[in-house]
């Protein structure tokens, strides 16, 4: 039997595809958004957390998975209290992630707004770089961060901006100053 406190990872089915989650005794190490196949998602997790073994998630990790699933099913779920293990992330990145975790589902913030909240108003590009390296997408909701004037900006997950747009649509987000983000042509 696998020790539930050992670093591990698991795959789980979501409305956007097969995601993966990796954990340590301190918290969630990473949340992998879907790759093209479940096998590719598994391979990405194995490369990124080589010491982790695929196993059944412990109770706390399963609760995190359940909450992510609820969010991706359209629930207004706050994931801000899920314990994370970001020990290896640079300090500036951790600060950016803390601010991003305060953005409620269905709302957005710009890279510049996060930079201003951190007291570094001219470092919106650095905020974007930190979010581009976010190992715990969804839990640290980098998809809720937009460029100036509500522009989508980039998204490093498989599917790029289309994936970001889909997650925001599930959450019911609106573009900053532009009305519904996903208004359909009639």
Ranges and model annotations:
Residues 133, 139:
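Major-groove DNA-recognition helix of helix-turn-helix-type DNA-binding domains
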Residues 144-146:
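Short, basic, alpha-helical segments at the C-terminal edge of helix-turn-helix-like DNA-binding modules
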Residues 88, 131, 156-159:
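Structured beta->alpha junctions
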Residues 1-122, 170-186:
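Basic nucleic-acid-binding alpha-helical/helix-turn surface characteristic of O6-alkylguanine DNA
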Residues 121-131:
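Short, positively charged loop/turn segments that connect secondary-structure elements
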């Amino acid at each position: 039997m696998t020790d539930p406190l050992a670093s591990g990872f698991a795959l789980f089915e979501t409305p956007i595809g097969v995601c993966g989650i990796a954990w340590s005794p301190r918290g969630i190490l990473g949340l992998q958004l879907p790759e093209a196949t479940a096998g590719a998602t598994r391979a990405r997790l194995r490369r990124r957390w080589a010491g982790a073994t695929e196993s059944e998630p412990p109770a706390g990790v399963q609760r995190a998975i359940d909450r992510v699933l609820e969010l991706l099913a359209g629930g207004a779920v706050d994931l801000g209290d899920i314990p994370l293990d970001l020990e290896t992330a640079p300090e500036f990145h951790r600060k950016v992630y803390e601010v991003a975790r305060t953005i409620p589902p269905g709302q957005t913030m710009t890279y510049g707004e996060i930079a201003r909240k951190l007291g570094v108003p001219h470092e919106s590009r650095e905020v974007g770089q930190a979010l581009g390296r976010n190992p715990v997408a969804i839990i640290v909701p980098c998809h809720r961060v937009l460029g100036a004037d509500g522009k989508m900006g980039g998204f490093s997950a498989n599917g790029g901006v289309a994936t970001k747009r889909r997650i925001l649509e599930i959450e019911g987000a609106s573009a900053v100053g532009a009305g519904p983000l996903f208004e359909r042509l009639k």
